[in-house]
Amino acid sequence: NLSKADSIQDFEIKGISLGDSLLDYFTKEEILKNTYLYDNPKFSGTRIEPHDYYQNYTGMQFTYKTNDEKFILHGVSGLVNYKGIENNCVKIKEDIENQITVLFNNEQYSKRVFDTPYYELDKTGQSTVNMTEYVFDTGGSSRISCIYIKNEELKKDYYDLLRSSFQSEELVKFLSPGFIEEFEINGLSV
């Protein structure tokens, strides 16, 4: 569930916010066991799936500075794989978007919506992503995406996916001037 927020730093997914220490939720061993590095070593990430802490999600991804021993969060993503169930990703995505517009009604933001081939994972361009991105005037961004795997070969290892993510202003600036879409982790963009 989403919680009331005055700024992107106050926004929560399952009680986890930007600026929190990941150690408040997981052991150091859990974090390090699931750590991956970006192409640029300034930030690292952890993908933890599934976990009793967030039963409604198939997994969560967290981004923090590589050498930060407290694992302070600069990015939080909730993930839902749609294996074996009816894919109602668009409805859930729209519900999350509606909640964001209510929760951030006092904050100015720009919004863009697009459908595009999902080349980050599928070089054939068969798979697609439907994404809404909010960039907040006070810093930070949010993305809500439905990723549809249409390449038969990839369907063996990947599933359609809903991703709801939030990034700090520092992480957004780090990912710029290129598009955030260009950043890949195990085939999934941040």
Predicted regions and their residues:
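Cleavable N-terminal signal peptides
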Residues: L2-S3
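Amphipathic N-proximal alpha-helical interface segments
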Residues: D6-Q9, L32-V102, E107-V190
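N-terminal targeting signals for Sec/Tat export/insertion, comprising classic cleavable signal peptides
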Residues: K14-D39
